[in-house]
Amino acid sequence: MPDTSLLPQTTSPLAREMRSFTGLFTEKTFDWDAFPASRGFPDLARAQLRYIGAGGSPKSNDPSTLKAEHFTFSLVNQPVGKFAASHAHEVVEHFMVLQGVLTVGTVWGDEVVEVKLGPKDLLLNKSGRPHGFRNDGVEPVLMQITVGSGTPEMPVHVCHPKNKDLELSRRFGAPGPEKIELFSPESADRRHLELGKHVVRHRDRVPVWEKAGFARMTYVGEGGAPAHGYSMDMIHLPKGVAVRPYVREVEDAYFVLEGALTVGWEQDGEIVERRLGARDLIFNPAGRPHYFRNDGVVDAQFTMVVGSGKPQPVTFEAA
C-alpha cells in the first residue's frame, strides 16, 4: 500500500468526487415527513435519514442523497409505541436493527406471524409479501433499510388506518390475538419455514476469516438470506489491518457500525482517502479501484452492500 501520509492536502477533482460519494451522519437530518401515507396519523410517526436513493419515500430529488443504482440505503427511527402499517413492495426490502427491539409482522391473508429483531439482526422481506413493523419496546428503534432497486415503486398498503380500524392496523390486519403467531424456527408450518430463510440472527453468524486479515459474516447472499439484486456482508476489521485496492464490476457501499474506517480511491496514479466514523457511509462506483484500512485504536465493524446478488470475483489481499 503506498504511503499517503505525505500526500499534498490540496483538493483535487478526485478528492471532490470522493467527497460527493460520502454521506456523513453528522451532516444529515432525519426527515419526519418522508412518508406521505403517514401524514395525519400520529401512530404512524417515524423518521427517515436517506443515504442512497429514497427507499420507500417519494423524495428521490433530495440533493443530500446519493443516486441509487441497484439498491437504496437509509436509516429509520421508530419511536416507542408507533408502527408502520402493513404494505408490500415489488422488490425485496431488508430491515437490520441498530438499536432497540423491532417487532415485524409478516402477513398471510388475515393471519400474521411476528418476529422480534434485536441489534444486528436482519429480516429480508420477500417481494410481494405484505409486512409491517412496530416498536413495542422501551427505547426508540433505529434500523437500517435497504430496498432492492434503485428506483422502487411506492409501497402498496394492505391494512392502513386511513380505511381500517386503528387497532386492526396496529395488528397488521389480524382480527384478533388468535390470528397472530410468534415466529418459531423449529416450526414445520410453511409460513415459519419461509420466514426462517429470511431471518438472520447476529448471534448465529459464523465469521469467515479472509487471508487479508478480516472476518466476513454473510447477511444477504449465500449463507444468509437469499440475495435478489444485491448482497450484504458484515465486516469485522481488526485494528491495523488493511487491504490492497480492488475493483468490482458493480458498485459497493460501506456503512460504519463501530470504530473508524479509512477508505481510499485510486485513479491514474493519484490516491485520495477519507476517514469514516460510526454511521458514515461511502458509495464506491463500479470500476473504481478502492480499499479500506483500520487506523483506529479499536476494531472496526461495517456493512458492505454489493450491487449484485451474484457472487463477485473479488480476491482481497492484505496491504
Describe each PLM feature range:
Residues L75-V76, S86-A88, V92-V97, V115, ...:
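His/acidic/aromatic-lined binding-pocket segments of jelly-roll/cupin-type domains
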Residues K82-A85, T103, L123, S127-F133, ...:
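Histidine-centered metal-chelating micro-motifs
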Residues P79-V80, E90-W108, K239, E249-Q267:
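Glycine- and acidic-residue-biased ligand/ion/polar-headgroup-sensing regions
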Residues W108-S127, Q267-A286:
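Short acidic-glycine-tyrosine-enriched beta hairpin
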Residues M1-E69, P161-G229, R244, E317-A319:
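A short, N-terminal "cap"/entry segment at the start of jelly-roll beta-barrel domains
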Residues N61-K67, F83-H89, T106, E114-V115, ...:
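Short histidine-centered beta-strand/loop micro-motifs
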Residues H94-M96, L123-L124, V138-H157, A253, ...:
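A short hydrophobic beta-strand segment most commonly corresponding to one strand
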Residues A54-N61, S74-H89, R216-T218, D233-R248:
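Conserved short histidine dyad/triad with adjacent acidic residue
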